[in-house]
Amino acid sequence: MVEVFDKYKDLIQEGDLALIWISRDNIKPVTINANETFNTRYGSFPHKDMIGKPYGSQIAIRTKVAKKFAFVHVMQPSPELWTLSLPHRTQIVYTPDSSYIMQRLNCSPNSRVIEAGTGSGSFSHAFARSVGQLYSYEFHPVRYEQATEEFKEHGLLDKNTIITHRDVCKDGFTIKKTDETSYQFKADEEQLQIKADVIFLDLPAPWEAIPHIDSVIDNDEKVGLCCFSPCIEQVDKTLEVLEKHGWFNVEMVEIQGRQYESRRQMVRSLDDALERLSDIKKRKLAMVERRQKAEEELEKKIEANEKNLPELPPKSIEKSKFNPFGKGYRVKEGDANFQWKEVTKVESEIKSHTSYLTFAYKIKRNEDENLDKN
């Protein structure tokens, strides 16, 4: 399988592709070089400090200006982390969608998968880790070259991935010797025999590619298809063509992912509420007494014709340190002086719609038998 993304190693070595975790939404791919430094707004992290450390280690530095500590984590690449850090060439398939698609299509080490188009290569890495053979197609020449170079660096082309520059909507999926492809043809081989049992279409017009699928699928297997479509209008056209070409068990699914965060909530008892009310009452009475005293002193000064009149005290109430509700005096979450309970909180920004997933299945052998009977 894939070396960089599939074989785990303990220690960081020079030349490794590592993912620097700055924050949950900020992960950067870096090739480790002892003479280089990884720069962030929090500080600079020399690569030599990372070499020899276990993957997952926290690399900390002390900033000169603020005299505070800054840190990052060095992670080993995986398809899931790569999805969060890769350079975007197109819209990508995120892990909530890709994991569901692979489970729904029963992908396994024996699966032979067709993926069109390659795009940014996010799903390609997940497929390459889990399936037996991956045939990936990209019609855009620049994206094809970028993906080919990336797959080569990550070890995908040496294992189970073949990428081809081809417009499958017009020219179909058959890989010929004249095509620009990573597959190495033999001298007497004119075209590559593909018997796929899983099809994934991430195309603007998947309905144009569906008629070409029959020539490259396994006649003896149940073939699963998934179309990744951002617009419902694309789904409508795809459904018409799927029905026309004999696909069955058609179903459309939309994945909505939410992230739940672990939090602690202060336990509020009746005694706390009564104590807080008592605390508020004491502070108000103290404020009234101070103002009355200040007013009396002011009247005496006026009567004595003093020129420099004292200022009235501020109207704000002096904050008390007791506050079980977190108002006024700041209470830090998890403070040992208070009682807490574990709760969950949904992330504030819910991820919006990505795409519709249209699933369908086909057994070509049954089609051929029906044609023979007719």
UniProtKB/Swiss-Prot annotation:
One Pfam family matching this protein: GCD14
Key words, A-Z: Methyltransferase, Nucleus, S-adenosyl-L-methionine, Transferase, tRNA processing
Keyword Nucleus among record annotations: yes
Claim: Transferase is one of the keywords in the record: yes
Classification via InterPro entries: SAM-dependent_MTases_sf, TRM61_C, tRNA_MeTrfase_Gcd14
SUPFAM superfamilies: S-adenosyl-L-methionine-dependent methyltransferases
EC number(s) per entry: 2.1.1.220
Gene Ontology BP annotations: tRNA methylation
Record-level Gene Ontology MF annotations: tRNA (adenine(58)-N1)-methyltransferase activity
UniProt xrefs under Gene3D superfamilies: 3.10.330.20, Vaccinia Virus protein VP39
Subcellular location: Nucleus
Gene Ontology, cellular component aspect: nucleus; tRNA (m1A) methyltransferase complex
Reaction(s) the record says it catalyses: adenosine(58) in tRNA + S-adenosyl-L-methionine = N(1)-methyladenosine(58) in tRNA + S-adenosyl-L-homocysteine + H(+)
Family: Belongs to the class I-like SAM-binding methyltransferase superfamily. TRM61 family.
Subunit and interaction comment: Heterotetramer; composed of two copies of TRM6 and two copies of TRM61.
Role this protein plays: Catalytic subunit of tRNA (adenine-N(1)-)-methyltransferase, which catalyzes the formation of N(1)-methyladenine at position 58 (m1A58) in initiator methionyl-tRNA.
Protein name: tRNA (adenine(58)-N(1))-methyltransferase catalytic subunit TRM61
Source organism (scientific name): Candida glabrata (strain ATCC 2001 / BCRC 20586 / JCM 3761 / NBRC 0622 / NRRL Y-65 / CBS 138)
Gene expressing this chain: TRM61
